[in-house]
Amino acid sequence: MAKKSVANLTEADLSGKRVFVRVDFNVPLNESGVITDDTRIRAALPTIKYLTEKGAKVILGSHMGRPKGQVVDSMRLTPVAARLSELLGQSVTKCDDCVGDAVNQAIANLGNGQVALLENLRFNPGEEKNDPEFAKQLAANADIYVNDAFGTAHRAHGSTEGVTHHVDTSVAGLLIEKELQFLKGAIEAPKRPLVAIVGGSKVSSKIGVIETLLEKCDKLLIGGGMIFTFYKAQGKSVGGSLVEDDKIDLAKSLMEKAQGKILLPTDVIVADKFAPDAEAKTVSVDAIPDGWMGLDIGADSVKVFQEALDGCGTAIWNGPMGVFEFDKFAVGTEAIAKTLAGATETGTVTIIGGGDSVAAVEKVGVADKMSHISTGGGASLELLEGKELPGIVALDDA
């Protein structure tokens, strides 16, 4: 079911109204409390600016880290308020709590087009418990609710689900609208052929995605550490590579179900130890030496994967091809990132499905060349699995 978007609200709907926006400002800080990557803050700007330009009083709420219902000074959102003020070109009021009299007063003092940022929502135990009383307190300061935090949309928390029960209008922000358009679109009505690339170290964390994508896609390329569980299922020797022995039967059944849709690497780069300075060599997947572990896909596999991606209508990528944190074993991941960047230019819809793949395309410097980069980790996976996300379900239907 399509959801109502903030873009459906006009100046008449918004001017002078208090709008509570759940954003995802869970940004990394260094030891000095300086933000090292402000991507998530910048991603929320279109929604915030849309609201301020139409005269709304904007109240932002986010979590940072996992304080588990306690106040943790190193997880305060003060540096976020400072950075947001710079990006918006206006002073953002920073509250020292997320509910209570001082917060109510700060919001009452907001003028049209002004912005306040609440303190870390997870300092309050009611947030993660989805406590109705906490949700009611959050909603007391809002005429309209906007969810633009895709990264937490798969959680039924006070600020993502509970608050919608106490506000008349609940809509998706521009970022969530774009996520739904691309991720749901890729699964429900993709431009074909649809090729999916799934990587990462464990089959167990990607089972749901692999099963759903197998039904929907024309080809499924598998890389990363999980390939060794598939090889073992085929009776190959995998040396010292990572294997989930309890998932071998599952890998077998996925291969049977796939009816030739799954493409596995034919060669891998193996290492004598798990370290950036390990000795490395490329071997066939039928000749992995004892004691050596596969840490990347080989050059032949890269070629085969590139051919499979050539001319595809839609490509979805989730998970790296190898241990891309070590430069020696980042070759496969970087090659896929560059291939997808090139494919976008020739008309392929390229979707980077959250998590480590996002870090990979950023590392290679091709993030701006993709059609869509998802801001969710678990939320992206669950949407690609075809699951309903509580934070989305709770919004008003279009």
UniProtKB/Swiss-Prot annotation:
Matches recorded under InterPro entries: Phosphoglycerate_kinase, Phosphoglycerate_kinase_CS, Phosphoglycerate_kinase_N, Phosphoglycerate_kinase_sf
Subcellular location: Cytoplasm
Its EC number(s): 2.7.2.3
Major localization listed first in the record, in broad terms: cytoplasm
Pathway: Carbohydrate degradation; glycolysis; pyruvate from D-glyceraldehyde 3-phosphate: step 2/5
CDD domains per the UniProt record, alphabetical: Phosphoglycerate_kinase
Top enzyme category: transferase
Sequence positions that bind substrate: 24-26, 40, 63-66, 122, 155
Alphabetized UniProt keyword annotations: ATP-binding, Cytoplasm, Glycolysis, Kinase, Nucleotide-binding, Transferase
Catalytic activity: (2R)-3-phosphoglycerate + ATP = (2R)-3-phospho-glyceroyl phosphate + ADP
Chain sites annotated for binding ATP: 206, 294, 325, 354-357
Any GO MF annotation of the entry: phosphoglycerate kinase activity
GO cellular component: cytosol
Name of one Pfam family that matches: PGK
Record field: transmembrane: none
UniProt cross-references to PROSITE patterns, sorted A to Z: PGLYCERATE_KINASE
GO BP annotation list: gluconeogenesis; glycolytic process
UniProt xrefs under PANTHER family: PHOSPHOGLYCERATE KINASE (PTHR11406), PHOSPHOGLYCERATE KINASE 1, CHLOROPLASTIC-RELATED (PTHR11406:SF23)
Record's subunit section: Monomer.
Record-stated family: Belongs to the phosphoglycerate kinase family.
Protein name: Phosphoglycerate kinase
Gene that this polypeptide is encoded by: pgk
